[in-house]
Amino acid sequence: MTQVTEPREEYTHYLPDVERNRAAVAGEREVKRAGVKFLPPLASMCCDTSYDDQNGMTIINQQSGLTLEGQAAYTKYKALASFYGATGRTIDGLVGLIFSKEAVCELPAIVDYLKENADSKGNTLRSLAKKASTEAFIAPRSGLLVARPSTPQGASQLDVEMNNLRPKILHYKYESIINWDYEVINNVEKLSLVILKEQVTKRRGFKVECEDQYRVLELIDGVYHQSLYNDSGALVEEVMPVIINGNMSDEIPFYFIEVGAENKSVMNDLVDMNFHHYQVSADYNSKNHFSSFIIWYETGAQQGQNMLMGNGVKWSNVSSDATF
């Protein structure tokens, strides 16, 4: 039986694309921190040599990863590469254009508080919209959940305020929406399942740790239910219908945000070109770096002490007649 923590195959397939896009948006520091994930090493960096005494031959051994000497060479190779933050700058500019003017926002008085505190975390409705717009450029899908605790029939506005029962709008990124499904109910296709991976903090003294939990939204016999599981898949909160003013809902109040082609971010092509330039710059800058030094060539030399080569090096002559 599939565990609640097991993601949908489609989610797993496109997750690397989203991670790649996020790194490009974050910029050079994040890209370089990922190392070989975005900048493959040269073949020579994964090779070492050994000497075959029996045949008098030097053997080149290919390793699965960087060798000790290769690690030092790769560090230099990566440092010389340049990643220009074209993707991040483009998204910042486009989102800036979208929100260059204040939107007209007309809300009923009972939910007017959403303008200043849309998600119960102090984020304004405008700020939440900007986050959702930014995410729409990065990932093929994200979503908004209209979250509201169950409220009994006849609950007053004072009850809602005093018991933290206000509705709120929560934004979930691609990585958090691990599973979903649709069903045809009364000749209409409806969202029948959403599994959301959430992170909560647990404080033990002064130590704060993050733990995963899984919120399940589903239609059972046409009624909206919620349940909660911990990171090991154990049930934490029983499956219960969500009651609003004493009434049950027949739909899941979760709304997908999907822009562009199916399962493709609108920024994918720009991201791919951004990484292509990054990898080309690594080769080009590395070539320039090593070819910029003098190449010494010596003939007629006899076996003797090795000499250090490079800038900042002085060769000393043991002769008393030496000059420099």
For each feature predicted by the language model, list its residue ranges.
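Charged, low-complexity, helix-prone segments enriched in Lys/Glu/Asp/Gln
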Residues: 18-35, 84-90, 128-138, 215-218, ...
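Extended, regular secondary-structure scaffolds
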Residues: 136-257
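A short linear-motif detector with a strong N-terminal bias
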Residues: 121-125, 171-174, 273-276
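Tryptophan-centered short beta-strand motifs
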Residues: 57, 66, 224, 235-237, ...
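Extended, helix-rich architectural segments
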Residues: 1-169
